[in-house]
């Protein structure tokens, strides 16, 4: 895969590290793993800090992470709902359908998206990507709402792909 690494494959879920250079070409990244037959993905943003605590050049920034997730979501929502499992997208839809999150961290409680965000309960370096996750949650909300409503009507969320054509 161009720039990305498969660092672990438990059963069918592939953990893919997304470096800065990968995040610049989200459509290529998506089509590359799709073409390789990978159908279940966990995206791991590459974060490396220098001695001063700043992100290194190879790291994904919050802004780029958000743009990457949105572009990947656009590829997925238009062609591959229920065909390709992207853990973040699946987890977000589950939250829209009523799955509960544990109590968020104090610094996340004011965020409009804390109920969706898996990082709101962890003290992790991923918090440097909050703005990126917020951009993704905001962008994907209308689509998630439609898929949630389809599921509540005992219909397939795949119907959204037809609606978007």
UniProtKB/Swiss-Prot annotation:
**Annotated Gene Ontology MF terms?**
oxidoreductase activity
Under InterPro entries, the record lists:
Aldolase_TIM, Sulphatase_maturase_rSAM
- Superkingdom of the source species: Bacteria
UniProt-recorded name of the protein:
Uncharacterized protein YidF
């Amino acid at each position: 895969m161009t720039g990305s690494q498969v660092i672990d494959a438990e059963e069918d879920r592939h953990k893919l590290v997304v470096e800065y250079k990968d995040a610049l070409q989200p459509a290529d990244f998506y089509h590359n793993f799709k073409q390789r037959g990978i159908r279940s993905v966990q995206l791991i943003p590459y974060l490396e800090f220098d001695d001063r605590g700043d992100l290194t050049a190879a790291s994904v920034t919050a802004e780029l992470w958000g743009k990457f997730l949105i572009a990947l979501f656009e590829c997925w929502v238009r062609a591959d709902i229920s065909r390709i499992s992207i853990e973040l997208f699946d987890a977000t839809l589950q939250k829209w359908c009523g799955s509960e999150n544990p109590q968020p961290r104090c610094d996340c409680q004011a965020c409009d998206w804390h109920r969706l965000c898996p990082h709101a309960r962890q003290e992790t370096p991923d918090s440097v990507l909050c703005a990126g996750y917020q951009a993704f949650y905001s962008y994907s909300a209308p689509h998630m709402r439609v898929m949630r409503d389809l599921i509540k009507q005992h219909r397939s969320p795949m119907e959204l792909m037809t609606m978007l054509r």
